[in-house]
Amino acid sequence: RQFSIMAVVWGVVGMLVGVIIASQLAWPELNFGIPWLTYGRLRPLHTNAVIFAFGGCALFATSYYVVQRTCHTVLFMPKLAAFTFWGWQLVILAAAISLPLGFTQGKEYAELEWPIDILIAVVWVSYAIVFFGTVGTRKIKHIYVANWFYGAFIIAVALLHIVNSAAIPAGMMKSY
């Protein structure tokens, strides 16, 4: 339920940032000369908010709901599931602060700096443990196809994140 609510919140925030940067294309002075409100700083924030904050929360919410219903059981390790919620919100908050400040790797859809990437990895591994643990403790024999797709998505995103976000740290908030 928490992920569903935050999906709506982050969706609205992401779309509002999109409206701001779209308006800046017509009226560049809308950044008011403030560096962290420029198009170049807000565009990565918009894409990350819509994809990872809105989309990520929606996928967490639906996968957690579906796996419980189709496996006829509660989530495996509920406290770890709660950690995935708060950890993911922390990732989003860290991105919302660091991107406008210009802390970025400059890689499309992998802009976040290495400390945030590590937090993403920890949250994602926790998510995999909760999801696959729930499938493993199911009360029915077969696994619904939706769970195969969610499982594939979890593995694919993990691989994509590891490969696309691989970086060499050059400082606390800088990597190459």
Feature names for model-found ranges:
Residues 1, 109-110:
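Glycine- and acidic
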Residues 103-109:
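Inter-heme linker and motif-flanking segments adjacent to c-type heme-binding CXXCH motifs
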Residues 175-176:
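Long, highly hydrophobic alpha-helical transmembrane signal-anchor segments
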Residues 2-103, 114-135, 147-172:
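Hydrophobic cores of alpha-helical transmembrane segments in multi-pass integral membrane proteins
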Residues 134-142:
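Inter-helical turn/loop segments and adjacent helix faces that build the functional surface
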